[in-house]
Amino acid sequence: MVKKGLRLLETKAFSFSEVMMKAAVLEKPGKLAIRELPDPSCPTGGVVVKILRSHVCSTDLHMWEKGHPALRYPRILGHEFAGVVAEVSNEEKRLKVGDRVQVYPGIGCGSCEYCRRGSENLCPSMRILGFSLDGGFAQYLALPKSGVENGCLNIIPSSLSLSEAAMAEPLACCLNGLEKVKLKKDETVVILGGGPIGCLFAMVAKHQGSGKVILVEKDSVRISQARLGLEVDLLDANNVDVVEAVMELTGGLGANVVVTCFREAALEYSLLELAAPGGRVLMFSGISADKGVVPTDLNAVHYRELALIGAYGCTAVQCQRALGLMAEGLEVNWLISKRVTLHDLEESFSNLASKNVMKICVEP
C-alpha cells in the first residue's frame, strides 16, 4: 500500500520562492492543465532538480485516461526523467549544482526488510514520484532528504544525452524482469507486445546473449517501427497463429522465457502454451482491473515444470546499471518518435493511445 504523498502546493512539506515554474497538472482523469506554480525551495538535506527531459510512459497514459483509486488530485505525473542539480542543501555534500542526474522515482523507507536487501521497489511505504508525489512533467522538482539518502539521484555518464538518461528507468525495469527469470545465454525469449517496453526487453535480451528473440505485435505501425531498430523475429499476430509460429521458430519446443509487455497479453495469448517445458513466464505487465481473473492451467504448470514469475518496477541500483548499459553502447534513441513541450503533453497522450508513436520526449 502506497503511503499518502504530498499534495500539490502542500506547504507543510516545502516552502516556496516567488519565482514561478510551469507544470502539467492532472486535475482529474482526462483533464490536464498547464499551470504556473511557485518554484520549490530546497528541502533540508535535499536538492532541487531542474528537469530537462521527461519521457511519457504507458502508466502516465493510463493515469490520464482512467486515473487510479490511490491517486490524489491535483498531481504532476511523470516518472521517467533527468536533469541537472539546481540547488543543494547545505547538509548535502555528495552532490553539487550542475551535476547531471537521472532520477529514480521511488522513495522507500530505507529501513524495512525490502529496503535493507536492495528491493526497495517492494517497500510497503514506497512513495513514487509522479504518483504519490509530484513528478517529472514540470520544470523543477524538490527531492527530499530521504530521496537523496536512498539513492534516487544517479550521476549521468558524460557520453549520454539527457534524453538517453531519462530512458534509464524503463530500461532498468527490463533488467529487473530478466534478472527475475534468470535469463541464460542462448535461451529463446518470446516478448508479447512491440511497444517501447517490448523493444527494450528485446534489446536487453539480445545484449545478455539470448539465442533467439521473438517479438509479437498486432499494430502495423509498431511492427514497422520495431523493424527499424531491432534484429529479432517479428510476428504479426493478425496474420499468424502465434503458438504455431513460435513452435515453428523453436523446433517445436517453445520459448524458455515468455514476457508480457501490455495489459491484455495474458488475455489475448496462451502464455503457457508458448513456453517450453521448464520455461518461465514473466508477468511484467499487470492486468486491467475490469478484465477479471485470468484462468491458469495449473496442471500445465505442474507437469511441464513451468514457473510463473512477477516483476514490478526496478531499483535505484538497476537504474545505475541501465545508465552503464547505454554508456557501453546500447542504443535507445531510435525509440524516441517525437519531442514536445509541456503544452503539447495532452495531445501526446492521445498520440500514445493511438499507438502512432513509441516514446515521446518532453522538454519542459
Spell out what each predicted region is.
Residues 38-54, 67-116, 157-159:
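Glycine-rich beta-strand-centered segment in the early N-terminal region that forms part
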Residues 109-192:
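NAD(P)H dinucleotide-binding glycine-rich loop of Rossmann-like/cofactor-binding domains
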Residues 158-239:
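Mid-domain Rossmann-like dinucleotide-binding core that forms the NAD(H)/NADP(H) cofactor-binding site
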Residues 4-8, 12-13:
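N-terminal amphipathic/hydrophobic targeting modules at extreme N-termini
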Residues 218-219, 287, 314:
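Residues in the short beta-alpha loop(s) of Rossmann-like NAD(P)-binding domains
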Residues 181-182, 224, 229-305:
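Glycine-rich cofactor phosphate-binding loops and adjacent beta1-alpha1 units
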Residues 14-21, 269-273, 277, 315-364:
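C-terminal hydrophobic helical "lid"/dimerization subdomain
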Residues 100, 188, 279-280, 307:
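Short glycine-centered segments of the SAM/dcSAM-binding site in methyltransferase folds
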